[in-house]
């Protein structure tokens, strides 16, 4: 998560924590899992959490990072969905969830991708990884570099499948960031996580995410289970334009991870709402610029700003602009020149940078002289 978004998410998390102390927002449900987290996708606000920073085995949730890198390489043209991939003996021998690949056979790349996402197949996963990288070890190096890039400081990968291994771990916090990045950066690929069944060589297998059948608002994202990890599930649901993500790790069984996810999602949708405060890249206000070719500068946000708040309180939401200094040219497009403050009633809940939406070059001698006279006269 880049710095402005992390800062905003922290501010919103603190606000939501305070809101939960209000009698209008009940405490989060007690769910049976070792660590869990509920968050809003658009605002990044954490609505409820338990031990979300603890390092645990992530099981096949690992494949979210594998998928992210595969999607990156697909977008850049390093592989294609229509090409054929030869299955290595090592890929075919993978234990755990499989689509029963045979060494030496040639399989369409898209079939392998669907097998990895829908069935969480380890043989399909490794066949893809070996195709796009020198070997699994080289691919895992890329996975850890990407984890560092995303700020996943509680995460380290040892393999691409999620099988239990010493030094292979993540946290609910980190997995939320990873899942959110995948949804945001590859919306065209995210639809694959909603596919309920997968057929290969006349064998039909089903998506292990039971919520795809139980809740029509759920459209992904991934299950996992190993002896060390227990039963895990990251579920995303969208209702009335609001998207939530629930991360449940270390449940005792399949029913436990499903129940925990359902309870968390229902709690979030029932008691919170997310509002768009301002679009990104559009003028929010205009300010005076001195010593420049132009006398006014449009200010706005880098990206859309959403806030999550207790239901029914959006009428109390208001904003203010704080530039706080005389702006003098030159000013570059994208330069941070102030802040947008957001409050709910008298409680500040967010503050994000205002940027210049256009550049203002230094004015000519006459323009600068005229502005100096105006400033002197003030």
Give the positions of each predicted feature.
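Generic marker of residues within folded, mature protein domains
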Residues: 11, 26-28, 48, 75-77, ...
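Active-site-adjacent loops and short helices of periplasmic peptidoglycan-processing enzymes
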Residues: 19-186, 197-201
